[in-house]
Amino acid sequence: LKNLHNTKSPKIVGIASGLYPFLYNYYSNFTLVDSLAQLLFFIAFFLVIPIIINFLLKIFSKKITFAAKHYDLLLTFSNVVGFAALLTYSIIGPVKKIILLVMILMFGFSFLLKKHLNKVIILEYILALIVAIQLAVYVGNNINLSSGWKQLPDNISEVTFKKRPNVYIIQPDGYANANTLKSEPYHIDNSNFESFLIEKDFKIYPNFRSNYTNTITSNSSMFAMKHHYYKNPKGNTKEAYGLRKSIASNNVVVSVFNKNNYKTSLIIEFPYIIVNRPTLGYDYCSIPYKELSFLSRGFDMAVNSLDEMKKAIKENKNQANFYFIEKILPGHISVTKNQSKGKEEERK
């Protein structure tokens, strides 16, 4: 703690700028940022870059008169503006306009904090300590969640197909079943589409529904071919750890198709289910990791899933294929009252 009084130390000030936002980002979004590649990136983003900026300020203060005269103020700018910008990202993600607005506001506020930088830094470290404890408790409670629910009661994972048709799982997110669409809150006449499905020998399950509140919990159950109870009955708890890997990694469904020499393709329009960069079990994904920003929260880039589907079908027409096509938009209705826009707006 004695070193914290040295507010002109580039390392102390730089770490103070990013440590709490770094830990808060992991505490609030752990299931989105749990890969090693992301950890290394965020260490550089939250901690190394602020330290480098402060070292540069120190160098400039020795060579440039203006920087030397106003070094304390520049250091305050670096700390306060950096802390606010990084924390804003941790809370809302890469929303550039809001982050820029926060930086502008905190730039002005920094003039008032110039004489209190020592107290500001101590407060930032105290906040970091508090969230570090919260993060440790969360990780301790979740990192070792039992995967026993994924154990299958038989050897279906070793099945060998006698026929090899193309298989398509087409998932319009939140698309209600035939009976539900006709009633509240939807009141949608979907008879033309239902007639088309019947004409093409599709099987319609009128009252089919998911017991889960969102895409991740529902799909993790489907691809594990087992029911799980995470988030039940506590619907307001954080997303259970590891569920995304149950969808995008080598789950039992994908592994069965891989063992039967299928080409497996994950067609997604948003990187929502792969934002934490799990090791993919599919042969192909419509969003490669090299195009996925480390700052992404899953909805800040998009591809045309229909175009991707047409491309995949054309390229793979001479082999058996398994496709999981997830269409996020327009999304499911709100599942809690406080998030709902009201019956009429949700129906739209």
Regions found by a protein language model. Give the residues of each.
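A long, amphipathic alpha-helix that forms part
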Residues: S146-K162, K310, S340-K348
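Transmembrane and membrane-interface helices of multi-pass
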Residues: L1-S146
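Short, well-ordered helical secondary-structure segments
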Residues: V120, S157-V159, R209, A312
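Membrane-interface anchor segments at the N-terminal boundary of transmembrane helices
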Residues: V33-F46, S293, R297-V303, R347-K348
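Helix-boundary/low-complexity linker signature
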Residues: T7, K163-R164
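Feature captures the catalytic ectodomains and active-site-proximal regions of enzymes
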Residues: N29-A37, S61, G331-I333, S340-K348
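Alpha-helical membrane-embedding segments
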Residues: A132-I143, P153-F161, T180-H187
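Active-site-proximal alpha/beta segments of enzymes that process anionic O-linked groups
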Residues: I49-L113, R164-I169, G174-K341
